[in-house]
Curated annotation (Swiss-Prot):
UniProt protein name: DNA damage-induced apoptosis suppressor protein
Cell cycle among keywords: yes
GO CC terms, sorted: cytoplasm; nucleus
Species for this entry: Homo sapiens (Human)
Polar residues biased stretches: 817-834
């Protein structure tokens, strides 16, 4: 079978044979002859046992391709997929007595199998792989010519052979032949048990078979028996579309064989289901995601729309009837442009009391939908969502009566699901009936209790909200003993909250159009109200204690609360309150007062939790309070600094809040809150904290100076006088970091870092420049412990420290040579020291001759360099290295001078031969002047200062006392201070010479 194939897409019109399998040879696939127990192949001569014979499919179909007809015979195992089993398996299935009843003969079984094959193939399109197209007369190799030749000869159907059959769309799946055959067998067996030979009619199978035997079996009364015989699973499998064959349940309504009694029974079931849905809705089922509403709708869209319109008309008529008798009883009226209300009166009779459930509120939407909760989906197809949550059962019965005339309309069946979905849907409805009936009785009992309490109250508030452009409505609050009902009406989104039980209502916080001061202004005796609004925290506090109050108070955009003073015990007045419905005014006021007295702590908690809205109660007004909105400090700052003078709740006079929650307030009064004083009070607090930090810094410096004095017990005598005065005056500037840079030894403890005086002057000044919302520019975060904005004068003990440097002797054993305390003002700053050379060739005898000794290091405070993170000495920046005086003399290797060992340095310091030392120094200086243009200084051989850890660099011009006034050069000296003392090595003041680095 290796022939070439051509593919043909065609639709099956009819079957051409009734035998679909044949015994075939395993070698040549030809038909074999079965003789008794043996089989013989006439083509190839192979033989075998008849019991082991293989069977092969052979299906002959009449197909059409556009305007051409063909008879295609399909062979082979390619049909196994469509039959559901192999040809050999199908043969064994038919011959099995356990599968096929004994009452069915072979002919009947074959007829049922033929029906099953027709159901599976007829009307479907397939792609056939044709193999014998070359044997057609006049056929060429071109496929188009082949199709053209086949359509010749007066449109005669040409016989073709196909070895392949596939579906055009592999994704399409349908029932197989064996499935349909199994369904037909079950139906036929049921009729045999009922002693009636009946089978499904041709219409139900969508077939048109002309077999006389089948026609004699089938009757028109077989529909009901067929429905009864099939189980739910088999029924759904039978009616599921097979391939492209579709059967819709709605065809049952057009069937003449469908009896009138069964139609009335079906419609009765539908009406009962609709009533059960209405009852479930009337009982106020709280679940908005009921599976009933998520399933297929039992009402078409047109039916829903017309039903909603009729319901609106009926509700309007009912409203007129009820409003006609409400004159002697109180009423609840909620008026808004987005709602049309139905005013419900309190029934006079007990029979009418049972039917009273709640007020009817229907949204005026284009979809005519009744919303349940605000989270309900808008796209829900049904127009009667949770209608019973608002409607009394009597109105629902009116609506059902009005729409009952449409129940017999066959158009209702258009929206029904398929049978398998309908069965599940009806099962869900049946399971809901028991729960619904139990729920109805409990709901009615609950309604009776509510109406009894409603009778006891005899008073209601009817408030018409005032529409304000740009501002949302304040959520109304209903306070009740049994439940708390919060109804929020927004101009854009209308929604309904139901908070039941002891739960606190969820008051929606709405944004106000501005941040102005809010106040409560209420007048009594029905006079005009102020336009100030009660803040949301206060409303929350009132609603949180609703369990203690039985009166329903409805609050809208303009809060209308009757005043309550100690001298005035007027009630909550209502302009719409009827004369016969009033209760004692004193009782209501006492309840409100008790309510507010018990729950004032809740007000405090709510105000503390508000992020940027705090309450400030005026102390000079006994009958009023002002709501102030503070925008500057967040909640964190309020919690972290409880002592700050912000609008905390400790300033609220809770003593008279108990009696003045609803006190009257003058219309034009806006409170006496001074925001500027409050803001500057914060700055004063910050300055007090800054003063405390300054004192701490003074203590640190005192300890530091004491430790420094203790480190120089023999050479130093520090004076710590007037230390506190130095820190108070901020006029002079000093950086403690730079002081420790060159003055003090490494054993001293580090001092804290201070900010610059510019920042201090900004904070210390009283020139406060508020922003647009009167917020302070600097908060508490600018006052830091480690950096106070304050500059200090140079302490006196530092000058004393410099004086002690001069008192130290160069030669300890020689008491005659002491340093003079003169300190000139022309001392270089560290910036000048960096650029100054260590040795200068320019002599300045006229400047330094009158100085007997080195001068102390003192800098001008105005030229003081800010401190740095790293301490770098001028000698280190120039690349020089400090060496001792002995190494200084030995570094040059004078020809007439021997190297001075380090151990002889002590002898030089203590020697009394001044002339010898003077001569050596003169020779050294002469050599320096001679070689200054050629000698290059490096860190290893030409350093001047010793590497001793107790020596640091100081920039000051010095002349050795033993050199005399005739010296014309500059020298470097090593001062033999103690290890703990702060030594100093001075350098001369001279012009910078670039020749030293050439």
């Amino acid at each position: 079978m290796n022939r070439r194939r051509k593919f043909l897409l065609a639709s099956v019109l009819a079957l051409q044979n009734s035998s679909f399998i044949y015994p075939s040879c395993q070698k040549c696939f030809s038909r074999i002859i079965l003789v008794s127990k043996r089989s013989n192949c006439p083509k190839c001569g192979s033989t075998g046992e008849s019991g082991n014979a293989n069977y092969r499919y052979k299906l002959s179909l009449k197909v059409a391709e556009s305007n051409k007809l063909f008879v295609i015979t399909v062979f082979g195992s390619c049909l196994d997929t469509f039959f559901g089993l192999t040809a050999t398996g199908l043969h064994r299935y038919i011959q099995d007595p356990n599968k096929i009843p004994e009452t069915l003969d072979n002919d009947t079984t074959q007829n049922l199998l033929t029906k099953a094959v027709e159901t599976c193939f007829v009307g479907q399109s397939f792609i056939f792989g044709v193999t014998n197209f070359e044997n057609q007369p006049g056929q060429g190799s071109d496929a188009s010519n082949f199709l053209q030749q086949c359509s010749d000869h007066k449109r005669k159907a040409k016989a073709l052979v196909a070895c392949q059959i596939v579906l055009p769309d592999p994704g399409i799946a349908g029932f197989t032949v064996i499935d349909y055959f199994h369904q037909l067998l079950q139906t036929f067996n049921f009729r045999k048990l009922q002693c009636d030979s009946q089978a499904p009619n041709n219409h139900l199978l969508a077939l048109d078979h002309s077999n006389s035997d089948l026609s004699s079996i089938y009757t028109s009364d077989s529909t009901s028996d067929f429905f009864k015989s099939c189980s739910k699973d088999t029924f759904s499998k039978f009616w599921q579309p097979s391939l492209e064959f579709t059967c819709i349940v709605s065809q049952l309504t057009d069937n003449d064989d469908f009896s009138a009694s069964e139609q009335s029974k079906a419609f009765g079931t539908l009406q009962q289901n609709r009533k059960s849905i209405s009852i479930a809705e009337a009982t106020g089922s709280s679940s908005c995601h009921d599976p009933i509403q998520d399933s297929w709708s039992l009402v078409s869209y047109m039916d829903k729309k017309s039903t909603a319109e009729k319901l609106g008309k009926e509700l309007g008529l009912q409203a007129k009837e009820l409003s006609a008798v409400h004159s002697s009883h109180h009423e609840i009226g909620v008026n808004d442009s987005n709602l049309f209300s139905l005013e419900m009166r309190e029934p006079l009779e007990s029979s009418n009391t049972k039917s009273f459930h709640s007020a009817v509120e229907i949204k005026n939407r284009s979809q005519h939908e009744l919303p349940c909760f605000q989270h309900h989906g808008i796209d829900t197809p049904t127009s009667l969502q949770k209608r019973s949550a608002c409607c009394p059962p009597s109105l629902l019965r009116l609506e059902e009566t009005a729409s009952s005339s449409q129940d017999g309309d066959p158009q209702i069946w258009d929206d029904l699901p398929f049978s398998e979905s309908l069965n599940k849907f009806l099962a869900v409805l049946e399971s809901e009936i028991a729960v619904t009936q139990a729920d109805v009785s409990s709901r009615k009992h609950h309604v009776d209790n509510d109406i009894d309490k409603f009778h006891a109250d005899h008073s209601r508030l009817s408030v018409t909200p005032q529409r304000t452009t740009g501002a949302l409505h304040t959520p109304p609050i209903a306070l009740r003993s049994s439940q708390v009902i919060v109804k929020a009406n927004c101009s854009k989104d209308d929604f309904l909250f139901n908070c039941k039980g002891n739960l606190s209502p969820s008051v929606e916080k709405e944004s106000q159009p501005d941040n102005k001061v809010e106040a409560v202004s209420v007048n009594h005796n029905g006079r005009d109200m102020s336009e100030y609004f009660l803040p949301n925290p206060y409303l929350s506090a009132l609603s949180s204690s609703s369990k203690d109050l039985e009166t329903i108070v409805t609050l809208k955009k303009t809060i209308r609360i009757s005043p309550h003073r100690e001298s005035d015990h007027s009630s909550l007045n209502n302009k719409y309150l009827n004369g016969c419905g009033e209760i004692s005014v004193s009782e209501m006021n006492e309840k409100l007062t008790t309510l507010c007295y018990r729950k004032y702590n809740d007000v405090s908690d709510l105000c503390k939790l508000e992020n940027k809205q705090y309450c400030r109660w005026s102390k000079n007004q006994d009958d009023s309070f002002t709501i102030c909105r503070k925008l500057t400090y967040p909640l964190e700052t309020l919690c972290n600094s409880p002592n700050r003078s912000t609008n905390t709740l400790k300033e609220m006079p809770w003593g008279h809040i108990n009696n003045n929650v609803t006190q009257s307030y003058s219309i034009g009064y806006e409170g006496s809150y001074d925001a500027s004083a409050d803001l500057f009070d914060d700055i004063a607090k910050e300055m007090d904290i800054a003063t405390e930090i300054t004192k701490k810094s003074q203590d640190i410096l005192l300890k530091w100076g004491t430790s420094l004095a203790e480190s120089h017990p023999s050479e130093s005598d520090f004076s710590l006088r007037s230390l506190s005065e130095d820190f108070i005056q901020p006029s002079q500037k000093l950086s403690l970091q730079s002081l420790s840079d060159s003055r003090h030894s490494r054993t001293c403890s580090p001092t804290p870092h201070f900010q610059s005086d510019s920042e201090y002057n900004f904070e210390n000044s009283q020139d406060f420049v508020p922003c647009s919302q009167s917020t302070p520019i600097s908060g508490f975060h600018q006052t830091r412990i480690h950096g106070i904005n304050r500059a200090f004068k140079k302490p006196v003990f530092y000058s004393d420290l410099d004086g002690n440097y001069e008192k130290i002797r160069i030669f300890p054993e020689n008491d005659k040579q002491q340093a003079s305390p003169s300190c000139p003002k022309n001392i270089k700053t560290p910036s000048q020291k960096i650029r100054s050379p260590i040795v200068s060739g320019v002599s300045q005898p006229d400047v330094f001759n009158h100085y007997p000794f080195a001068e102390c290091h003192e800098t001008d405070s105005d030229e003081w360099v800010p401190p740095t993170t790293q301490k770098i000495f001028p000698s280190d920046m120039l690349g020089f290295q400090g060496i001792g005086l002995g190494k200084c003399l030995a570094a040059y290797h004078f020809p007439d001078q021997q190297e001075l060992p380090r151990k002889k340095l002590k002898h030089i310091r203590q020697g009394t031969n001044k002339g010898l030392i003077k001569k050596k120094l003169k020779n050294m200086l002469a050599a320096v002047v001679t070689k200054k243009k050629t000698h290059k200084y490096n860190c290893k051989s030409s350093g001047w200062i010793s590497k001793c850890p107790d020596i640091q660099v100081l920039a000051a011009p010095q002349l050795h006392p033993i050199l005399g006034p005739d010296s014309c050069s500059e020298v470097k000296c090593c001062l033999p201070f103690s290890e703990k003392g702060p030594p100093s090595v001075c350098e001369t003041r001279s012009a910078w010479s670039p020749e030293l680095f050439s």
